[in-house]
Amino acid sequence: SRFRLDAEIVRDNALAVSGLLMRDPIVGHSRPYQPAGYYRHLNFPTRRYAADKGPAQYRRAVYMHWQRQFLHPMLKAFDAPSREECTAQRPESNTPLAALVLMNDPTFVEAARALATTILGAEGRDDKQRIEELFLRVLSRGPRPVEIQTVLQFLADCRENYKQNPELAARLL
């Protein structure tokens, strides 16, 4: 589909397929990662943001802390409306900013790491079987033969790159 999920569901889905999503209802709100100094221009009163530690930050987006005029950057990148006014329909943009959030936001990096740990931890499977399981978990379908070949080539390229640059692998982990 050319239409993507709403901002909150993008986050929840990434956490769910990785096994990190905490589904327990809570009292209060959850504070996921946020860039340092993001609230520095917020006045009346000035505020400091402290992200939750541990599983609390992986609760569903419906429990996320929202500051009315300073929408969480991940939500903003995926066109979530601010709480300043009601909207009947969300805008849908297609910008590189959303892709950059998926690649760099600590929540998504941790979700990718957790998913990779689960897939790689399944003993007795070769790369093709792992790719098939990954597709089923993330896309709810099996991979086409061309997709398997593409991912296998990408995997070989990544392995070679990290073998030559172990500091990059260490930084990612």
Regions inferred by a protein language model and the residue ranges of each:
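An acidic, gly/pro-interrupted, aromatic-rich
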Residues: 1-133, 138, 142, 167, ...
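Extended, well-ordered alpha-helical scaffold/bundle regions in very large, multi-domain proteins
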Residues: 142-148
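Amphipathic alpha-helical segments that form the core helices of the histone-fold
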Residues: 149-160
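Acidic/polar, glycine-enriched structural segments that form the non-catalytic walls/loops
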Residues: 159-163, 171
